[in-house]
Amino acid sequence: MKTTYNFLFVIICLSLLACQTTPSDVLPRIAIAGLGIESSTFSPALTTEEAFHAQQGMEIMKDYPFLNPEHKNRSRAQWFPALRGKSLPGGIVTREAYESLMNIMLDQLKKNLPYDGLFFDIHGAMSVV
């Protein structure tokens, strides 16, 4: 639980530090990142990194119809997809999986700083052991 709060704190700080005022003729720079799972502490199963089917870079864009190349929203910003992973509902997430995915995500986010916004695609209730 403490790790989750630490991660959220880091993301919020990165977001705030990375924000800048942009002139109206410059497109906003928006990062995309997120993880999602419904994990149950009552399940004996452990959820590993592979279960998230993590995507990186432009591969992420295909999951958002409103960001397809022909959609008008695609040209309204500069998009910087970092990492996105979604898992089926399962057991507690292993610490190794969580830390690996978070490190990849944070490294990807740091590459293109500063941002004007973050599309933080999260869902569920994640427990990490």
Regions found by a protein language model. Name each.
Residues K72-Q78, K111-D116:
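Short, solvent-exposed loop/edge-beta patches enriched in aromatic
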Residues F7-L16:
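Bacterial N-terminal signal peptides
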Residues M1-N6:
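Positively charged n-region of N-terminal signal peptides that target proteins for export
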Residues A31, L35-I37, F42-P44, F52, ...:
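Active-site histidine-anchored catalytic micro-motif
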Residues A77-F80, R84-L88, A97, L101-L106:
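Low-complexity, highly charged intrinsically disordered N-terminal segments
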Residues D25-S75:
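N-terminal amphipathic/basic leader segments beginning at the initiator methionine
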